[in-house]
Swiss-Prot record:
It comes from Clavibacter michiganensis subsp. michiganensis (strain NCPPB 382). It is found in: Cytoplasm. Keywords: Amino-acid biosynthesis, Arginine biosynthesis, Cytoplasm, NADP, Oxidoreductase. The gene is argC. The active site is at C152. PROSITE patterns: ARGC. It catalyses: N-acetyl-L-glutamate 5-semialdehyde + phosphate + NADP(+) = N-acetyl-L-glutamyl 5-phosphate + NADPH + H(+). SUPFAM superfamilies: Glyceraldehyde-3-phosphate dehydrogenase-like, C-terminal domain (SSF55347), NAD(P)-binding Rossmann-fold domains (SSF51735). Belongs to the NAGSA dehydrogenase family. Type 1 subfamily. This is N-acetyl-gamma-glutamyl-phosphate reductase.
Amino acid sequence: MSFSVAVAGASGYAGGELLRLLADHPRLEVQTLTAFQNAGERLRQVHPHLTSYADRTFVETTAERLAGHDVVFLALPHGKSGAITAELDDQTLVVDCGADHRLVDEAAWDAFYGGDFAGAWPYGLPELLHAEEGGTQRTRLSGVKRIAVPGCNVTAITLGLQPGIRAGVIEPEDIVAVLAVGPSGAGRSLRTNLLASEILGSASAYAVGGTHRHTPEIRQNLETAGGGHVSVSFTPVLVPMARGILATATARLAPGFSAHDVRAAWELAYADEPFVHLLPEGSFPNVSDVTGSNTALVGLAIDEAAGRVVTVTAIDNLVKGTAGAAIQSANIALGLPEAMGLPVNGVAP
């Protein structure tokens, strides 16, 4: 049995990555591709790399076009999902790759996004640890009909730090995260600061001083994992790589814990995870190791002089950071094998 799929916003980077991954999925069948300004164009004009869809045509993005499918993936700009979702049947599985339904706290939404608060949906990070109820988020995704996919930066920081927060081996205050990110995370719209002539040979910090929209979502996740208040200073740095995130995060080592205790916490958290892997001691990931894959690689060290734990996490922002997480979560919701249709191996060189 196959499930019929519509991808809204299929002309963008996230939408295109959804199509690339879904092309090899044995149970999810893409029937409808929608776009805004690209409606009416053939897919090969926008995504020439997606040969299997080359002669398909984008249709306009309306609730009417999306209705009647078993699964609808939304890869739309922030603020565009709520109105469309309200018109879809509540038995349709809707997976939103935008930010509209990620935050639980309405005040945080108002402070960082603004506009109408659409409410939180079940969160699409299966590996997210839960301090109070125990277990992981995957048990809370089974059978749901609405899923909010995490922000890509949020996923990288959460996967890097949550084992230590959950085990209490790192302090939840004074966490610092600096992320090297590629421009595809900002979407496909033309912006001067994302031009090759501006990016190549350079690097630039942005949203400095806790102003990035992913900040409250990072806190939300780490507080879910740890059960208490968390403070995080998060700074993204735009670097000249098309895709990928390398997240370097540090936190104070909690009193009374050793390097052995720290490593044991990460090993326990990720021992059975299909897509999150702790690297051997002394090894740290490269972004190129995970390109094109749904895998997250985590390196771990102790800075003895500073008394801090250091994690380095690499993900592909378009796969594990967006489209892969969407499909992984949809698999769980539909009762399919969690890893179905998702690549574990990266592409090299």
